[in-house]
């Protein structure tokens, strides 16, 4: 029906009972092994601030989607995965393109809010805190 309001899955700021809000960063990657260290060096402090902006118990996860890399990108990311690290890897069987990789990442993200981000730093991680604050403000 046209003009009918679209129901929201959950109001902004609604956390899982007993846990704080979860921010998912979805990062499609293709042959990004050379930039991963720089990306993570900038992302980690930005995520710390973004988690604080989420409010008490704010949490984050990074969902990398390897789009058929042949330069060791997936192996490098796999080395970051450990219990409690908040890093996940979705590995596509071949290069399907950025749109497909992003869609796969969105499907695997668990966050109350999801931010797509490129590993080549086209999207400055330092903006995450402001983005989260704007989202929280509605």
Predicted segment positions?
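Structured catalytic core of nucleotide-sugar glycosyltransferases
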Residues: 2-138
């Amino acid at each position: 029906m046209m003009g009918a309001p679209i129901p929201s899955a959950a109001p902004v700021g609604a956390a899982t009972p007993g846990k704080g809000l979860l921010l998912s960063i979805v990062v499609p990657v293709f042959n990004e092994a050379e930039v991963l260290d720089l990306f993570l060096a900038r992302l980690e402090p930005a995520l710390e601030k973004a988690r604080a902006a989420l409010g008490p118990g704010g949490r984050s996860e990074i969902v990398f989607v390897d789009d058929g890399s042949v330069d060791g990108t997936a192996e490098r990311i796999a080395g970051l995965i450990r219990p409690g690290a908040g890093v996940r890897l979705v590995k596509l069987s071949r290069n399907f393109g950025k749109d497909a990789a992003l869609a796969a990442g969105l499907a695997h993200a668990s966050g109350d809010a999801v931010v797509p981000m490129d590993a080549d730093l086209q999207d400055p991680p330092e903006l995450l805190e402001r983005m989260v604050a704007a989202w929280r403000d509605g």
